[in-house]
Swiss-Prot record:
The entry's keywords: Cell inner membrane, Cell membrane, Cytochrome c-type biogenesis, Heme, Iron, Membrane, Metal-binding, Signal-anchor, Transmembrane, Transmembrane helix
Similarity field: Belongs to the CcmE/CycJ family.
GO biological process, one term: cytochrome complex assembly
Protein name: Cytochrome c-type biogenesis protein CcmE
Source organism: Sphingopyxis alaskensis (strain DSM 13593 / LMG 18877 / RB2256)
Binding positions for heme per the UniProt entry: 123, 127
Classification via Pfam families: CcmE
Periplasmic side: 29-145
InterPro entries given in the database record: CcmE, CcmE-like_sf, NA-bd_OB-fold
């Protein structure tokens, strides 16, 4: 075989390998991909029952209700224009609380309740972990970059 043909075969094999890796990566991410929805979008009918999505908003004041099992909580997510009831079973993040930002991964139920599989608590850019409160200011600057 000539060197030109060997290079062509090598290039085609490399291209097939890259394409195969891309297909595998895309199929792996398909299950993880979820649309981000706000309560007003969900109230407007943009969320189908059973569709995997992320719900973002604020936890409404006075809406957190803990169930007797100690793990299940119910609360209302709001964006100031609409509200969505949320149910979650698991341990909530330390920063989760009333009037705090949150993002929940899950699905809508037919009764209009968002059933979350995971909850992330959002914080503003001024948040500082309690452990950093004890550090001298020059060390904080070095850690923060």
């Amino acid at each position: 075989m000539k060197a030109k043909h060997q290079r062509l075969i090598l290039a085609v094999a490399a291209l097939c390998g890259v394409a195969g890796a891309g297909v595998l990566a895309a199929s792996a991410l398909r299950d993880e991909a979820a649309y981000f929805r706000t309560p007003v979008e969900i109230a407007g009918g943009k969320a189908a029952v059973g569709e995997a999505m992320r719900l973002g908003g604020m936890v409404a004041k006075g809406s957190i209700v803990r169930q007797a099992d100690g793990l299940t909580i119910r609360f209302v997510a709001t964006d100031g224009q609409a509200s969505v009831p949320v149910e979650y079973t698991g341990i909530v993040p330390d920063l989760f609380g009333e009037e705090s930002g949150m993002i929940a991964d899950g699905r809508m139920r037919a009764d209009g309740t968002f059933v979350a599989d995971r909850i992330l608590a959002k914080h503003d850019e001024r948040y500082m972990p309690p452990q950093m409160g004890e550090m001298p200011k020059n060390m904080k600057a070095a850690v923060e970059g």
